[in-house]
Amino acid sequence: MEKELKQLKGLLSSPVTEKQHTKEFFRGKIDDHEVILQQCGIGKVNAAIGTVEMIDAYHPDLIVSSGCAGGASTQLKITDVVVGTHYTYHDVYCGEEVTYGQMVGMPAQYEASEKLVQQALSLNSGVGIHAGLIVSGDWFVNSKEKIREILGHFPDALAVDMESCSIAQTCYLYGVPFVSFRIISDIPLIDTDASQYYDFWDRVAEGSFQVTRSFVERL
């Protein structure tokens, strides 16, 4: 989303805008690290295309995805950050021969680098950081009924978004380490009023975006 990209671009020194096929990329530095930013867009296909173009053009050492997600646990608070340890789809069913959420021929879940997850958990960023399962699908989850349906398949899920697992699958196929940070914008089990989500952006959540900066600085 544009609001997320604006936050992250502000972290870059001497940013340069570059065009690769249909996507704009922003190259710059955070401390001594060369960083490339892009806005993939919403949904699994946009995320996968953006990831492929990033890998083809820049051959990154690792990919970090930053965005917002709905909280699947009532133990979370809005503006907490979930670091994905595993990723799967909540809207994929390929028959009884494979696990719900699993594409045939692919893992049931995609794992983040344990080293990257531990680095994220060690950050002293001033926000609550949690690690766990992120589930993804092309569905804006804004009802108790839908989140309960998802939790029926994935009771350990901490966050629900529309991109993380497709990026994880693409990185798995290309052999690129990956981790996703998701800032909790709303918690459907607590309140299904969509104003939670918009209030989150009104509050800007400046501190939460510092997780990404702190993470890069410690690589």
Which functions belong to the PLM regions below?
Residues M1-Y58:
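N-terminal short beta-loop-beta anion/metal-coordinating cradle
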Residues V141-D193:
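A C-terminal functional module that forms or caps the active site or interfaces directly
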Residues L11, K115-V127, H153, T170, ...:
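Generic non-transmembrane alpha-helical segments
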Residues A72-F154:
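Mid-sequence, gly/pro-rich, charge-dense loop/helix-turn segments that line enzyme active sites
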Residues E53-A57, S73-L76, A168-P177:
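Alpha-helix C-terminal capping segments
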Residues P188-L219:
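His/Asp/Glu-rich mid-to-C-terminal helical/loop segments that flank catalytic regions of hydrolases
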Residues H59-V64:
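Proline-aspartate-enriched helix->loop->beta-strand connector
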